[in-house]
Regions:
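Non-catalytic interaction-recognition regions
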Residues: 1, 11-89, 100-101, 105-567
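Short, charged, solvent-exposed linker or helix-capping segments at domain edges/interfaces
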Residues: 90-95
């Protein structure tokens, strides 16, 4: 967002990039110390002056246009700036009136393409809790970048290829009639897979049959391809139920199989570089000069690896989408894999625009309060079961607190699923997420339900008053109390917060901000009578209530959370 403009900075700026200067500006920890602070020690080394002297020089030279800054203080080596509060209130509320639900958006990404590769479950296997984080973090990054004007391409790079399909085809040939895969595809296919896998361990010839099936599939055999397509379509249909619950949509489902015929080109290009060498039964690119283990491109039996498929995907995406960034949202366990792939991608002859903008966005594990997440039998927890459990727990809470609530099921869905999403996004993604129902569904904690509760409160205040005042009727002076100003300043920062979340690929920056805004409104609501005051005060406070609700709803939407209208 625009910082106050100044002129007449003399020599101090001459060798300083204005972007650097802008990045140095901080928000003081204590509100009494001003609205912005500039740490002069950041210039001390280059200017060969003490921070205190730089602060004095700057204070004398700075001239602000339009009286945007009313006071500048020096504290230690800091310059502290105090904004013109009435001007700030007027600027923020006029912008809200003009932009409405687009408030905080930007066209900074106009004309730029961003590929975001996330979720990516395996066909014919359970869509489990391990896929929650990539799905939720990826979706939020997608929405945030879209809000900033980027053209986003969300890719669900499905695990739909590999030797396991040879086994599934063999199992289905033998016992397909015994299983109802149309009705319950993933559970039934899992049973077939376990059964054929056990048989392979006992009988080498069955394993050979499975390998032959996959070879046939690779060669385009009609029967094997038809079965593979059936398994894939049924799995996607089942995955879609979960995506519908989370309201997530993809622009492409090109997964592993899509690149099966595109890997030969990668291997050819790498062969021409002379860097593809044989080693211990594999074909590798040596990365010892980068202090990394070698990147395995193929096995001697001719089969390819994940790395080869990822390299083929990079080439395809560069050509198809002309991307400005290609982002991968996966677990931190894949950090080395992507470092290797991104290094080898530099050998593919692609423009640096593509190879310099490959970005891995890693995240930590999910743990319950007492360790890793799994059921009593050691099976993984299905994501659909987890989301249904969240909804049913919220229904129980609603029954206890507000049994006559209309649309109970729909509201419980928004709160329960919102709670799961918010819990996932509330901390920096690299930290392991602790999964604890009581914390997550606490309506007074730093949670999704708390933000929804405060949003619903803004709606009920406006419903009670029966109107949203017109901006021209607002007397901005009526919002200069401490609690109102705190909200105005937070709303002013919304666009900047969204940009930071995008730059760092960290939705938690936005999640934390929404908690601060909700808490500020709660405090304002508890200390101020909104309806029934003097008409000018009422109109000003109602408009601020409307603005708060607007930003809470938009911010939650960027995290992938829907707001209920009642609770």
């Amino acid at each position: 967002r625009d910082q106050p403009r100044s002129r007449g900075l003399g020599d101090v700026y001459k060798r300083q990039d204005s972007k650097n200067i802008y990045d140095f500006i901080e928000t003081p920890p204590n509100k009494e110390m001003g609205d912005y602070a500039f740490p002069c020690f950041k210039l001390a080394k280059e200017l060969k002056k003490a921070p205190q002297i730089i602060a004095n020089d700057l204070k004398e030279q700075l001239v602000f246009e339009n009286n945007e800054i009313t006071k500048i203080d020096i504290a230690g080596g800091y310059l502290n700036f105090y904004v013109n509060e009435q001007m700030l209130i007027s600027t923020v509320l006029k912008e809200i009136e003009k932009s409405k639900e687009n408030y905080g958006s930007s066209n900074v990404g106009q004309g730029k393409n961003i590929v975001i590769d996330y979720s990516s479950p395996n066909i014919a296997k359970p869509f489990h809790i391990g896929h929650l984080r990539t799905t939720v973090i990826g979706n939020s990054i997608y929405k945030i970048y879209k809000f900033l004007g980027y053209n986003c391409i969300g890719v669900n790079h499905l695990g739909d290829w590999g030797t396991q399909f040879g086994k599934l085809i063999e199992g289905y040939k033998r016992w397909g009639e015994e299983y109802n895969i149309e009705e319950n595809p993933i559970d039934e296919l899992t049973k077939i897979y376990i059964r054929i896998n056990n048989l392979c361990k006992e009988d080498e010839s069955v394993l050979n049959d499975c390998r032959n099936n996959f070879k046939k599939l690779e060669d385009g055999d009609e029967y094997c391809t038809k079965l593979w397509k059936k398994f894939r379509d049924l799995s996607i249909k089942e995955f879609q139920r979960v995506y519908d619950m989370l309201d997530i949509h993809f622009d492409s489902l090109n997964g592993e199989a899509f690149y099966a015929d595109k890997m030969a080109e990668v291997v050819q290009i790498l062969e021409k570089t002379g860097k593809l060498v044989e080693s211990e039964g594999a074909r590798i690119i040596d990365l010892s000069d980068k202090n990394m283990a070698p990147c395995i491109i193929g096995k001697t039996n001719g089969s390819t690896t994940y790395a080869t498929r990822d390299l083929a995907a990079i080439m395809y995406r560069a050509r198809e989408y002309d991307y400005d960034k290609n982002i991968y949202v996966t677990s931190y366990e894949q950090i080395l894999h992507f470092k290797q792939v991104f290094e080898v991608a530099k050998l593919l002859g692609l423009d640096e625009k593509y190879t310099d903008n490959l970005i891995h966005v890693p995240f930590g594990m999910i743990q319950s309060k007492d360790g890793r997440m799994s059921t009593r039998e050691g099976n993984v927890i299905k994501l659909e079961d987890l989301l249904n459990e969240a909804v049913s727990r919220v229904e129980t809470i609603i029954d206890a607190k507000n049994p006559n609530l209309e649309d109970k099921k729909e509201i419980a869905k928004k709160i329960g699923i919102g709670a799961v999403i918010f819990n996932d996004l509330y901390n920096s993604r690299i930290k392991d997420e602790v999964f604890d129902w009581d914390t997550m569904l606490n309506f007074n904690g730093e949670t999704g339900p708390y933000i929804q509760y405060i949003y619903v409160r803004t709606k009920s205040v406006l419903d009670k008053s029966g109107y949203v005042p017109k901006l021209e009727s607002i007397n901005f002076e009526k919002l200069q109390d401490k609690k109102s100003l705190e909200i105005v300043k937070l709303i002013y920062n919304f666009g900047e917060i969204v940009k930071q979340a995008a730059e760092k690929y960290e939705p938690y920056i936005l999640a934390r901000y929404l908690i601060s805004l909700a808490q500020a409104f709660s405090s304002f609501y508890n200390e101020n009578k909104i309806i029934g005051e003097d008409q000018q005060v009422q109109d000003a406070r109602l408009y601020l209530t409307y603005a708060t609700g607007l930003v809470l709803e938009k911010g939650a939407n960027l995290l992938g959370i829907k707001m209920p209208q009642k609770m």
